[in-house]
Amino acid sequence: MEPLVSVVIPVYKTEKYVVKSVNSILTQSYKNTEIIIVDDGSPDSCPKICDDLQKSDNRIIVIHKENGGLSSARNTGIDAANGKYVFFLDSDDTLYADAVSDMVKIAEEENSDAVIPDSYYKVFETDDRTVKAYHFTEKDFSCDPKVFALNVLIGKGRASRSTAVLYSMKCIKENNLRFPLGKISEDFFFNLDFLAVAGKISVYKKPSLYNLKREGSLSASYHKGFFDTILEMDEKVKEFTTKIDNKKYKEYIGNKRHSLLVKNTLVYAMSIMKSEQEPYGERVALCISIFENSRVKEAVSEMSEAPFFPGRAKTAFIKLLFGMVKKNMYRLACFTAYIAFKLAGV
């Protein structure tokens, strides 16, 4: 008999999208699923929509709870899940029709704790464009979870997304893995914890997810105070590299911790300069305070080249910013980022 797959869908203020999202699971070629919809105290019509969906198919379970955020909703879903595997899906995204079937087959045949897609589709709501994007290349992938974490999640700052990944429920529950509460970039923390304890992972060489890019979504927002999260991510990487067998993985560790910190810092500084929530001078002052952080300065000084970034134009721009920051040309770096956004929307 086909193993049961639990699909956890947190719902909050997505009344326009949730039905389409759930239907993308109901119409999967793989039928042995339980769909756990977690209404995270949504103040719109989502609770009623969820209840109506439950009436339409006996595979759907609806849990109503007080608002606690995305991590809280996902954790509620984990606690309720009965499947051999668990699959997370955001309530404004949809799945490729054979994704669950294909990924379960891979997990079963290769005895893997997770199956990770190498790519996904970005669907832009404003102009209805669909663009294929890659999490990582075939060359980057390793079935050793720790090597994958070091090379991709940490080394390139990629593939941190937990949605549309097939996870072993046994691995999650035996190691008491949960999404951290009250954090931005919760997927990164969860995946690093998972990869630290997983025995083997496999790759799905197709896009499994249609990821909706919409105005006002959580992932599209500029977050004040995100630098605190960047430093927490850096500490998490330090914890990860300390726990694993340094002798076995020494060649993979290198300066990847520094690289991720610098990449996250530069990207955040760029988002600050793009934002118009504060006056230009205040944005520059904030960026300078970040560049002068002792941990950032240490990481920059240890790196001889800019961190990885996808795309030629953005790679060139990151190299330019990195060179300025390395030479303590902070104000020029801020001005360059500001002008680039104004002229080209980098």
Regions found by a protein language model. Name each.
Residues 25, 40-41, 68, 91:
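Conserved short acidic donor-positioning loop in nucleotide-sugar-dependent glycosyltransferases
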Residues 274-346:
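Membrane-interface aromatic/basic loop that binds lipid-linked glycans or pyrophosphate carriers
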Residues 65-81, 91:
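Glycine-rich, basic loop-to-helix element that forms the pyrophosphate-binding segment
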Residues 39-49, 66:
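A conserved acidic beta->alpha catalytic loop
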Residues 13-27:
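Short, well-formed alpha-helical segments that are part of the catalytic scaffolds
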Residues 3-6, 24, 34, 189:
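Cell-envelope/extracellular polymer assembly enzymes that use nucleotide-activated donors
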Residues 86:
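Short aromatic/hydrophobic "clamp" motif used to bind/position activated sugar donors
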Residues 70, 91-204, 211-227:
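Donor-binding/catalytic cores of nucleotide-activated saccharide
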